């Protein structure tokens, strides 16, 4: 599949589904309610994967669930509809999903991780097994006066 084929595939899905495409300088964004995606031009396997992922936020499964589920659903949809899925695209998906887990762990325990055995972990490339959250890192609070004037 050539980059032009990839671009045409994304354009066809957008046309058929009534999704408006806006330019975006990096990564992508999507609005399911407004049926809009903002993406970089599709010129490679990675920009193709990202474009399909953003379309997955509009058309894919799990989009009304918490963020980690929605992200996994968008990648699942992208992988299923892609005309080709290369190792580079798989790596992009895996790195993105991994970054979402790190994001959730930093905000623990507010953010719900997908349960063990959920397809999220398979998409990430992690075998289903019990997982433990890392304990949240407590930030030491220092008063502004102490920062300005040091200890007294």
Where are these regions (language model features)?
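Alpha-helix N-cap/helix-initiation sites
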Residues: 49, 67-71, 86, 90
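Alpha-helical segment that forms one wall of the substrate-binding/catalytic cleft
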Residues: 70-82
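Anionic, Ser/Thr-rich low-complexity intrinsically disordered regions
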Residues: 29-30, 62, 87, 95
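A metal-dependent hydrolase signature that marks the N-terminal structural subdomain at the beginning
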Residues: 1-23, 73-76, 132-135, 139, ...
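Short alpha-helical catalytic segment bearing the HExxH-like zincin motif
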Residues: 46-54
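Long, well-structured alpha-helical subdomains associated
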Residues: 42-43, 84-152
């Amino acid at each position: 599949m050539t980059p032009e084929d990839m671009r045409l595939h994304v354009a066809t899905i957008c046309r058929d589904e009534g999704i408006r495409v806006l330019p975006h300088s990096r990564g992508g964004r999507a609005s399911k309610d407004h049926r809009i995606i903002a993406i970089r031009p599709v010129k490679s396997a990675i920009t193709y994967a990202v474009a399909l992922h953003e379309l997955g936020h509009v058309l894919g499964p799990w989009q009304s669930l918490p963020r980690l589920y929605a992200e996994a659903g968008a990648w699942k949809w992208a992988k299923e509809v892609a005309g080709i899925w290369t190792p580079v695209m798989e790596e992009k998906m895996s790195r993105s999903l991994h970054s979402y887990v790190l994001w959730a762990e930093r905000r623990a325990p507010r953010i719900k991780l997908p349960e063990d055995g959920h397809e999220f972990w398979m998409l990430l490339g992690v075998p289903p097994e019990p997982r433990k959250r890392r304990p949240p890192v407590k930030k030491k609070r220092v008063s502004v006066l102490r920062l300005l004037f040091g200890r007294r």
